[in-house]
């Protein structure tokens, strides 16, 4: 089980979300059988989605992040509910690339830098909020930071990391997101900048055994922070047979008739959890009748 924690500075001028998403990234790797670099990329996006989901207010709100930079991984999608429970998938789960010039997994090379980060927030209005920003890095954390600055005009700092073992399992994963609130004083900004300049990578801190509280404290440097709340988080798919039936109906009567006339069972697989739903021609026919 992962964990997400919210904090605020004593003067209320900045807040930070910090998360341990090791179990979430590990579950994604188990479901999608990703290679090392795509595990790292998807794990980072899931962590970002979890923290952005936790920022939503309504119980039924959700956020969807879609990243496509033209790299060999293709599109990456992560969706989170308002409690920070994400799910996601990557179009091409197995990508093999040399390590980058720092000797690290080449997430930028897998994601690509020629494309956009799309953010869709469903907060119960008639139409969801949709924002998009050009990919500036492909490393994902910098792209999240840029999204908040450009699309939401909110000064932010995002850090994400996933450490993958030689056997492709996940050793640790997590991240933090700092946002400045209106009227944030220069001293606070300066203290955060100083801390961020010297902080180790998220995965280094997690691998050293630092807790989420300790990582948040390091990220905020000399600033004192108060814990607001703490939640367990997990990889969570909300697919059901009823949702799949609804999706089948959107294919239209003509296509459903073709499936029925083929006389064979069909299999519908959920992209997020790989669960398979089977439908016989008779069940499809009943579904079509009920829809009329």
Roles of regions detected by a PLM:
Residues 197-292:
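Cys/His-clustered metal-coordination modules, chiefly Zn-binding fingers
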